[in-house]
Amino acid sequence: MANNITLTGLLKKAAAEFSDRRAILVSGEFHLTHARLQEIVDHAASLLLASGVGHGDVVALTFPNTIEYIVMFLAVIRCRAVAAPLNSAYTAEEFEFYLSDSESKLLITPPKGIEAARAAASKLNITHVTATLPGGDGLIALSPSPNNESSLDAVAELTNDPSDVSLFLHTSGTTSRPKGVPLTQLNLASSVQNIKSVYKLSESDSTVVVLPLFHVHGMIAGLLSSLIAGSAVTLPAAGRFSASTFWSDMIACNATWYTAVPTIHQIILDRHLNKPEPTYPKLRFIRSCSASLAPTIMGRLEESFGAPVLEAYAMTEAAHLMASNPLPEDGGHKPGSVGKPVGQEMAILDLNGSAQLPGFSGEVCIRGPNVTKGYKNNPEANKAAFQFGWFHTGDVGYFDEDGYLHLVGRIKELINRGGEKISPIEVDAVLLSHPDLAQAVAFGVPDDKYGEEINCAVIPREGSEVDEDGVLRFCKKNLAAFKVPKKVFITDSLPKTATGKIQRRIVAEHFLAQISTAKVPKFGA
């Protein structure tokens, strides 16, 4: 793959090649063609330049999934500035941290709501403006308006460079301190091309974005990969995922695929079981990423919606995609595997940096043009992550004889019970094969005898009744004795991140905090 490509260059090429095809649709309201979207983005970029935004400046954005957000995101990177998307649900204290850590110069929000972000920006003396798109298909208006006169010529004179940092995000992994991840035009361009290639995205495709666009999964896999392919993207009218409107949106836009985290797949499945739609669109594939998908859930999805479910493997530091199960015509998928590397080198290394043979586990390591050059202002994290010429993901996995990657778990999440290393993903899969369980997550807890013991939290299916003894009996039939959870928490909800991911650290802290005598484990630094 060429190392001189840029995301903005790919978007311009698509706008020229597929000028009259639909690019963005807002459910039940309006749509923009690829050419019109490019015009609106260039105009918004001219406003940012007139407002003093320049090369390398960090611009924070906090919006629901709206057309204004997409336009402003693309306009920021067109200016050779850095987009720093933030979750609108953050508290004022969280906004303070993220705005400060990213060194944001400007905050852009909708005219109403998100008061916590405004308060944080004010406290940090960061300029705040609002963005609106009157009528949905007009031109962006900023308030207050720029002091200087805007000029499209100034935008045309800009040349985006592959080395330009365009996106700044924070990780939300197993450590408690989020790490800042700068991603360049080359990183983003490489990733979207990888996604387009492995799923054969084209101008004939269409999808509904169900994930928040402040996260790489929704932004890169759902939105940007579609745009560079000339595809169409529908935004739900509510600005976020809604199970009640999901299939009507999919049918209305002639969707051919969608991507989601396992939690959303389960919500979609549960609605199908309890309130099925009269008809479903014919999908080329369903994609799952950002957390492990149990084979039983994959099977139910395929049976219910008649499309192959392709599980993928991704992380922020790789500008999202690292590996994916291929389409049926390219080799097919393996339940329980996250597929083959896509557009980058991948190796399974031991602690000394030596490659492991197929079937032997080690740390998953990658290198390629999609991978970040390093965390911002964090030499300790960079030293740990970049060794032997590879980026170390912190995940344990192995390749099978066919070259498919199987993940065992996060290094810091593997449960060490008296010297036996247990994969919580394996325990999850068994729990989710129970016919009366809708969701489940296993996690490690401190134990005086074994060092660590296994607990789990489960959500029963609607209308089902389960008890702890029944769940434990099921586990004893399907797991080795040392892998059986010691305690089962039965609940109606699990704590999730803003992107719908279930993190074991957070789940463990949540349930152990309910037991006054429990010692809450310490994870990471």
Curated annotation (Swiss-Prot):
Residues 242-311 are annotated as: SBD1. Its main location: cytoplasm. ATP binds at residues 171-179, 311-316, 395, 407-410, 501. It is an enzyme of class 6 (ligase). Keywords: ATP-binding, Cytoplasm, Ligase, Nucleotide-binding. One of its GO terms (cellular component) is cytosol. GO terms for biological process: fatty acid metabolic process. Its EC number is 6.2.1.-. It is found in: Cytoplasm, Cytosol. One of its GO terms (molecular function) is ATP binding. Residues 312-375 are annotated as: SBD2. InterPro entries: AMP-bd_C (IPR025110), AMP-bd_C_sf (IPR045851), AMP-binding_CS (IPR020845), AMP-dep_synth/lig_dom (IPR000873), ANL_N_sf (IPR042099), Pcs60-like (IPR045310). Belongs to the ATP-dependent AMP-binding enzyme family. Both substrate-binding domains (SBD1 and SBD2) are involved in the substrate recognition, and are sufficient to confer the substrate specificity. This is Probable CoA ligase CCL9. The lineage of its organism: Eukaryota, Viridiplantae, Streptophyta, Embryophyta, Tracheophyta. The gene is CCL9.
